[in-house]
Amino acid sequence: MNNAGNFFAGFFEELSPEQVRDQIETLLFGPMNVTRAVLPVMRKQRSGLVVTISSTAGITGQLFCTAYATAKFGIEGWMESLTPEIAPFGIRTMLVEPGFFRTELLTTDSTTYAQPTIDDYAKQTKEIVAAWKSMDGKQGGDPGKLANALVQLIALKEPPARFAAGADAVQVFEAKAEKLLARARAYDELSTSLAYEDA
């Protein structure tokens, strides 16, 4: 199970390139490296399940989460593309997108806030940091219940390719699906008029 976690929080302009790279290194390249190491064993035995913990931040972008969402969106694309590559060998994948769970993610050990350097962001930064710090230890999701749910899902003959973990995650999934459909329909005529005439 891939479950690396840290959080560089802040507005994009105030996050350093090094912080963004570190975020991607941990959240994306870390799981990639672990998976690359275990796939030969799974291919040899012609079975396996690669479980990767993503986030609702991999489904929809969020304020103050540019580095984190970049890495999580990367995980989503990587796993979606990896799935058909390894399916012929009996290997399945499962993405887990949790909402807010009462983990250590928002503690000072796991979250690094960007240094405020731009006045235009100062007020909002102060408000967001205060809100998130007050949320630490009060998140609604129970990690123990999530662990039990994952045990149930992993035991299934056909585990789901995606699992929205938490009521807030279900809401994020539904809102994103509705938004994508609305955007596709809004410019449907223009979108479908872009082919060559002889195509």
Map each language-model feature to its residues.
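Conserved NAD(P)H cofactor-binding loop of Rossmann-fold oxidoreductase domains
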Residues: 3-8
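Active-site loop immediately N-terminal to the catalytic Tyr-X3-Lys motif
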Residues: 13, 60-67
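Active-site helix of classical SDR
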Residues: 35, 71
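Residue(s) in the substrate-gating loop at a strand-loop-helix junction
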Residues: 55
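Active-site-adjacent segment of SDR/Rossmann-fold oxidoreductases
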Residues: 60, 81-92
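SDR active-site lid
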Residues: 88-160
